[in-house]
Amino acid sequence: MKAKEIDGNLLKLIITNGSIKLKNQHQQINDLNVFPVPDGDTGSNMQSTMMSGVSAIRNLENQPVEAVGKALSRGLLMGARGNSGVILSQLFSGFAKSFQSLKTADAPAFIEGLKQGVQQAYGAVINPVEGTILTVAREAADKASLYATPDADIEEVLEIYLNEAKASLNRTPELLPVLKESGVVDSGGAGLIVIIEGMISALRGEVYQEEQAKAHVAKVHDIEGEVEFGYCTEFIIQLDPEKRFNKDKLVKQLTRLGDSIVVVADDEICKVHVHTKTPGDALNLGQQYGEFATLKIENMTLQHTEILLNAESSVHEEATPTPHDVFRVEAKKKYGLISVVNGDGLHAMFKEMGVDRIIDGGQTMNPSTEDILSA
């Protein structure tokens, strides 16, 4: 029987199924990644973001769609990774907002959620670029809104959305020249389609299980010349209520530092994503409004170089990789970065930031020369 409406349990099921399908296929999405930076991590970032949302709703049973949607939104925002991940979190956060005060959601509420998701995602991106996941989501939501009848079931709505999303995805190379030059479609839009396919499968009774990650040599999309991409800088600030947060001011300041800027804020936290060559300056701008809940800095030039080295040597890890490490190999560097830290928390943070070797500084924070040389 077709579902005319969904409750909290069914919402959790379809979101989980879509997320798992994306996780199982994220390497194919990585292989499409050329914009905004060809660092091969769009699929990894999107699946990591969605699985964070899944973790936030996993233990919710027999809850109204409002409660599941609210938990999903916060989980996605807190776990959002990369430009594509933050945009994806906003698509689903806006989607969930249409469920406020609802125990169940029918097709009109579902369609309204798809439209609100687009509005919220566009609002979070400082300079929206067409030919990306934004375009795919917008055109698909518009088509669902126009052609889904008031008495449609949820599966019909998603099928209309999916068909238009696929058509829109095929048009992305005409909107974004770098895609056409590389012979690919937009990776973020492709990832969104995989999620929707998984959601529809759940409504049809096909439930996916997480598959064992397989070794994979990333597909290379090289660019001519020597290019520096800078640092993918992300952080969440726990806003200080005594410090007046000014989103417009922060955005203006970040614009001077870089691009691919996404800023999302509510009454408690602010999530920032920016590509910049001066990540420290970006962190300082954020910290004026509170303290860091999380932060991540990745050298995108190094990421791209490692993908090239990986493809040339066909060297890859045999151990089960993490989403971030799935395309990472140990490459010889001219220089290595060693940090001296004290405590497991700092150790984990610096490791996440890509430090090559970490020395436990102990109480004195003064390691010997031998300690440094042997690191």
Q: Can you name each region flagged by the protein language model?
A:
Residues 1-375:
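N-terminal loops that bind phosphate or other acidic moieties
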